[in-house]
Amino acid sequence: DRKLVMLEPGKKKWTLTFENKPSETADLVILANGGMSKVRKFVTDTEVEETGTFNIQADIHQPEINCPGFFQLCNGNRLMASHQGNLLFANPNNNGALHFGISFKTPDEWKNQTQVDFQNRNSVVDFLLKEFSDWDERYKELIHTTLSFVGLATRIFPLEKPWKSKRPLPITMIGDAAHLMPPFAGQGVNSGLMDALILSDNLTNGKFNSIEEAIEN
């Protein structure tokens, strides 16, 4: 429930400064705030890279009522379909909602600025209906039914460059902050959970003489 605005190393502890909240100190900082984290610089200088793929994501609540045709097409299973450069993935059982994502090669004219206004539902609907003009009507039902969309450029972190071995104080990263990857098949989520499991075990199993050794392992 706090927004971190500054992270500073002190003599023995980190100082965390929060927006409109008291500052705190910590012996160890674990970065788990996503691929666009501004404090990754303490661990690595590697910059985010664009993959050239763009994703549009959305959720439809009560899909059995709001988009029954597409919901029945899923038949209780996850669905994936591709055609002419567009890939659609749908999960009809996402905590009571139908979650779907559409991936495609980023158009050249989007390189500097996305040409679809994601604050304007009609702008997104018009774009998608044009892209899906020759798809089955049940896919178009999905688009027509959606109330809001989120647009995300797909980004990754190149893994060739090692993390900094000399850090001012104990600090490490897990999840997307550590290894951002395209959002397919749940691999990013699974990797993040495994990161957390391994790190928590290293910090508590008593096998290491210091925090630095635990996070290095």
Feature roles, as predicted:
Residues 60, 94, 104, 136, ...:
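Generic secondary-structure microfeatures
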Residues 2-142:
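Conserved FAD-binding catalytic core of PHBH/FMO-like flavoproteins
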Residues 46, 135, 146-149, 203:
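Alpha-helix boundary/capping residues
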